[in-house]
Amino acid sequence: MKKVIFIFIMCFSFGSLIAQDVAALKNAGNDALKVKDFAKALENYEKVMAATGTAGPDYAMIYNSAVCAIQIKNYEKAAKYFDQTIAGNYKPEDSFFNKAMVLKLQKKNEEYIKVMNEGITKFPENPKFKTDLAKYYLMDGSVQYNNGATLLKSAIDKLKSKKYKDTKDPAYLADIEKVKKEFSDAIPSLDKSIELNPADATAKTIKSNCEKQLKTL
């Protein structure tokens, strides 16, 4: 009986020490976060997670871990921790949006679009999902439009300098086909931007320019 009591006391004491250590690590993480030592904060938070496992996850701390990971540009960890806060329904709107931002930083564009569309569906009253996705499509369309404009200028310059014989020169015609492709490919992205943000005059103007150029080529 005494042996059982002794073992119980030892286990209780050991558990108390672990709890104290975990609390100390979490406090150290919070202190580091306050002074913007994000690497140190994340290190301490991860020690807490390693010690506690999956028992009663501290979603506030996990969310802070994701934020710290963004600050030190460890985007894989940031996405992982935002996945956990999404699963725990902790700050769901911010967790979804920030995960999408992390994916965009990683240039995982298809995954970014997927998460943003999920956010639009789940949180229709939150405008930032539509706003950011509209900007993404606007940028995508703008890049293709600018590529087309640059290629067109180059083709015209070569024509003026007699590098191309005339507008029937096969090399000139090949360049014009590339120009047409860039302008044509820009339009679907611009349409999506306009659909998400109908008031965006810039997207409408660029789309109109694409259409005008395609008619003249």
What are these regions (language model features)?
Residues 23, 57-60, 94, 128, ...:
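Start-of-helix register in tetratricopeptide repeats
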Residues 48, 84-85, 118-119, 193:
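Canonical positions in the second alpha-helix
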Residues 145-189:
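Short coil/linker segments at helix-helix boundaries
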Residues 60-64, 98, 132-135, 139, ...:
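Canonical tetratricopeptide repeat
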Residues 53-56, 90, 124-125, 198:
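Short coil turns that delineate tetratricopeptide repeat
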